[in-house]
Amino acid sequence: MSFNALPQSSMPLLMGNSLNAWSDALTGFAPMGLPLGLLVIAAIPLVFIALYALTYGVYGERKISAFMQDRLGPMEVGKWGILQTLADILKLLQKEDIVPTSADKFLFVIGPGVLFVGSFLAFAVLPFGPAFIGANLNVGLFYAIGIVALEVVGILAAGWGSNNKWALYGAVRSVAQIVSYEIPAAIALLCGAMMAGTLDMQEINVLQSGPWGFAHFFLFQSPIAWLPFLIYFIASLAETNRAPFDIPEAESELVAGYFTEYSGMKFAVIFLAEYGSMFMVSAIIAIVFLGGWNSPLPNIGSLALNDLTTGPVWGAFWIIMKGFFFIFVQMWLRWTLPRLRVDQLMYLCWKVLTPFAFVSFVLTAIWMIYVP
């Protein structure tokens, strides 16, 4: 595990010495001598990105839903209601943190925390540009796929610990849904890994760079890539409990699902984990199939659009914008498609997506072997 950053010759010497001192001081507390100071420093931008995604993700969803329902949405707090989410955060901070008398207090308390950790640990391997990645693992894609299992533990702990039948029903539905759809999602991502020849997410980005912009992206290099791309996008909706796969939180059936009994900051943490997962799966789609931090603009003659929009800052801009685009599509689908029944959801997974995922895997292998 390493922290990769481009050298900054203009960085003040005092700042460099301070960071080295903090890193040396914290190294002894990290497992296997890992420079914990660097990991803490690397985590700071990720925290801001996550909070940014939450703040404007919630605001964006309210505005999108209002537009589709011919409403204005939030308008009172700040210009065009842009501070509404901050007002909601302040409201949640003031709400009482209630623990039901009959609840298993240990499971009830750790459930949101485990869910949050499972959602945001994947951010460590997401490359937000050629100059920055928290943990450059050579199996980063495999890590991102597997870390979802922690979310299952958190959801089940929250549902069981609440000692509420609606919460338990919602947790069981969510666990069954996530575990089932993880199979076609993983196979679809392995198709992208097969095209790249590596599980290193930074290397996957590098292999999709070039002067022709989007023409170098895996999605446009092979006509077969569209199949695993669509399979993973559909499966990611189910993994994040987004419509039309939101049966674990069906208000008309289960009140609010596995977080029915939660209030205050515990509810806010669950909410943060949900929007963090939305951005995480959107970023993975962008990295594996759409070039990640690479610019989609091509060089056209003497107009070097790709060269002008490439670099560390541009890289972060492109991957965040691509991620937000897929978040917008998720929100769009929520207010467009009706909710599936449980039997329809499982039918789609096991009899449609999973067989097509295996077919796409075989076709991708054939394409990589026989097509130069």
Curated annotation (Swiss-Prot):
UniProt cross-references to InterPro entries, sorted A to Z: NADH_UbQ_OxRdtase_su1/FPO, NADH_UbQ_OxRdtase_su1_CS
PANTHER family given in the database record: NADH DEHYDROGENASE SUBUNIT 1, NADH-UBIQUINONE OXIDOREDUCTASE CHAIN 1
Main location: membrane
Record field: catalytic activity: a quinone + NADH + 5 H(+)(in) = a quinol + NAD(+) + 4 H(+)(out)
Topology of this chain in the membrane: Multi-pass membrane protein
Taxon lineage: Bacteria, Pseudomonadati, Chlorobiota, Chlorobiia, Chlorobiales
Quaternary data: NDH-1 is composed of 14 different subunits. Subunits NuoA, H, J, K, L, M, N constitute the membrane sector of the complex.
Protein name (record): NADH-quinone oxidoreductase subunit H
Matches recorded under Pfam families: NADHdh
Gene: nuoH
